[in-house]
Amino acid sequence: YGERIHHFAWSTSPDYRYEAGLHRDIPIHVLFRPGDLDWDLGAVVARSARALEWLEGVFGPYPYPQLTNLHRIEGGGTEFPMLVMDGGPGQGLILHEFAHQYAHGILGNNEWKDAWLDEGMASFLGNWFAEDVHGVEPWRGTMTGLGRVEAQGLPVPVATPSHEMPDYGTYGLLAYSKPSAILFMLREHLGAETMRRGLQLYYERHAFQHVVEDDLRQVLEEASGEDLGWFFQQWFHTTATLDYAVASASTERDGDGWSTSVTVTRTGEAWMPLTVEVGGERVVLEERARTQTVEITTAERPEAVVLDPDVVLLDTDRGNNRQALGG
């Protein structure tokens, strides 16, 4: 039994196997079919508890009286308040579907109008969890791969209503992959703790309400003290692309150290602050100019100039982000 439930489902079978556990005082129920060996021996119970614990650390306390995780017949996953149906026992899928308890279950966006608000958010949280808990960096491949897709051009913006997407492949990119990458860029721009503070405020202020994009933007602005209208407009409401490039770079002796001059160009209509790294020293370029030149001093002779060294931008061509300094 639960209250403030906006949609529901059920699944029945006389053959289900059952395991149970607790997160705090919240019962976790796991149902799976005979022969689903990867689901038993407490494995999925433990992964479910781990996912719920982490998500509470991002948003706040889970408000429902229980959570059920069952093995669905098909692959993938489906989410409902207090119930997720997972096509497999993997931690990543479990985290994604559990994330929907918050992003869509408790914070109820309209999936026809703003699919990215829950699917993109859940995908973002899945990658953040993998980074935070498992020490992996899923973002690097995501940003590089999406940058290549961006270079080919996407037909519509992320904020396009689901029924207006031209095909299912585009829907997958714009509801899941690209908004996940955009939210990662935003987290890196604001800082992880500011992002977390904003999501906690999102939950505190809008739990069990219908939410829209502006609700998310406003709490992140409040948490950061920064106007984010430019960011949301640029990345969610246009198809603008971004490509930073090293136009030229040279280095020379400067007293006891080395002075390196770097000229950077920007093509495409999008803009983000850019980190330039030379010999371990970093400078952030905040201007929106098409061409910028920066001088960076290092103690040792640097080997190369690298733009966006942490791979946090949706850059359409990473091949021009690095230039060796000969000599």
Label the predicted regions:
Residues 1-95, 124-127:
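Hydrophobic helix-coil surface modules that form long, contiguous segments used
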Residues 34-42, 85, 111-112, 169-172, ...:
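Second-shell loop/turn segments in exported
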Residues 40-51, 91, 95, 114, ...:
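Hydrophobic (often cysteine-bearing) scaffold residues that line and stabilize catalytic clefts
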Residues 228-229, 242-245, 249-309:
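Beta-strand-rich binding/interaction modules
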Residues 309-320:
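Short acidic/polar inter-strand loop motif in beta-rich domains
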